Amino acid sequence: MRVRNKPWAPELIEAHPEKIVEKGQAFKGQWNQRFEKEQPIFIEVGTGKGQFIINMAKKYPQYNFIGIEIQKTVIAIALKNALEEEIPNLQFLYADGAELTDYFEDGEVSKVFLNFSDPWPKTRHEKRRLTFKTFLKVYEQILVKNGEVEFKTDNQGLFEYSLYSLNNYGMTFEGVWLDLHNSEENEDNVETEYEHKFSAKGQPIYKLKAHF
């Protein structure tokens, strides 16, 4: 997702250090200090404009959520949306998802969400896919024992690749849905911006849950 730069984005981020972190290394192993309560931490890698992570935090106050995004304007939009309400169990991290071990201690995270990630369809770009084995190794390191990954996409090719990649890594599947919105799993589903857009066009949404 490429969004035109917003001139107000840097200023908004700088104005709210209580809600967004730009130097994640400073909080490695101490993320719960940024929340009102010490609770299991769930992260979303590639949080976009924040619809998913904001609504998840509101729906599940018993968990702490961190939305991670590498594009400054995009995360500024997410921050702006989040500031419209008081959501004490939500934080944002402006950072590269490929460097999670720099920002989180081993076992500091309880769950990783990957939603509508860039499919990087060309073979030479395989290593950039967020379900490539090097990313899985990173998730395994920062997650608690038997930590869980949830992945949603509209891209059948990426989903098939991800099933193959997670299986080869030795992960255990808890569930696989080839048409999420026409399944019982959809009862508790929280949509992303992309998900709402694609499902409205009749595009099936794919989902998996797996743990290490």
UniProtKB/Swiss-Prot annotation:
Lineage of origin: Bacteria, Bacillati, Bacillota, Bacilli, Lactobacillales
Keyword Transferase: yes
HAMAP family reported for this sequence: tRNA_methyltr_TrmB
InterPro entries in alphabetical order: SAM-dependent_MTases_sf (IPR029063), tRNA_(Gua-N-7)_MeTrfase_Trmb (IPR003358), tRNA_methyltr_TrmB_bact (IPR055361)
Protein name per Swiss-Prot or TrEMBL: tRNA (guanine-N(7)-)-methyltransferase
Top-level lineage group: Bacteria
Its job: Catalyzes the formation of N(7)-methylguanine at position 46 (m7G46) in tRNA.
GO molecular-function term, one example from the UniProt record: tRNA (guanine(46)-N7)-methyltransferase activity
UniProt keywords, alphabetically: Methyltransferase, S-adenosyl-L-methionine, Transferase, tRNA processing
E.C. number: 2.1.1.33
Ligand binding (S-adenosyl-L-methionine): E44, E69, D96, D118
PROSITE patterns with a match to the protein in the record: SAM_MT_TRMB (PS51625)
Matches recorded under Gene3D superfamilies: Vaccinia Virus protein VP39 (3.40.50.150)
